Amino acid sequence: YDGLIWGGSSLNIYNDTPEIRKQIEFMKNWQKKVKNILAICWGMQVAVTAAGKKKKKANTSHIGIAKEIEINRNGLNHPLYKGKNIKFNSPAFNFDEVVKLPEKGICLASNKVNKVQSLYFEINQTKVWGLQYHPEITYEKMVSLIEFRKKKLIEIRKVFKNENDID
């Protein structure tokens, strides 16, 4: 195959469950089989973990929008950001973050919430392009995801006090 796109999930990479371990092993396999992997949010967490590097629960989170993502010098020279504004906002929904890049990994962009908003690394002849945010999701869809997850966001995550905080 030429490529694989690995999208988001409501799972958290730092939870050590059989389902998560299976996904990490699955990613390790694909990191040997394809030329390119676009790893979005959860996909980036799985790709970095499969490459043997650290991630953790973020100190804060993105709920709806990742603001002021800033492309760094490495990112400006990377094809992922060709023609993109240096600072931008994007739909985002995450509680995890990469704390150590894979070997020869390059951070391409960051913001106040996540030092690694995007990255690039190669492993086993596979090029991995990782994004912590969700360019594939519209803002309208993000609003519906927040609505769908509101009980969890209030009762478990405690990022909102009540439903009025969400509106």
Region annotations inferred by a language model:
Residues I71-D167:
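Amide-donor transfer/coupling interface in amidating biosynthetic enzymes
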Residues G8:
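Glycine-rich, N-terminal phosphate-binding loop of Rossmann-like dinucleotide-binding domains
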Residues L11-G75:
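Cysteine-nucleophile active-site neighborhood
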Residues G3:
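Short, Asp-centered acidic motifs that coordinate Mg2+ and/or phosphate
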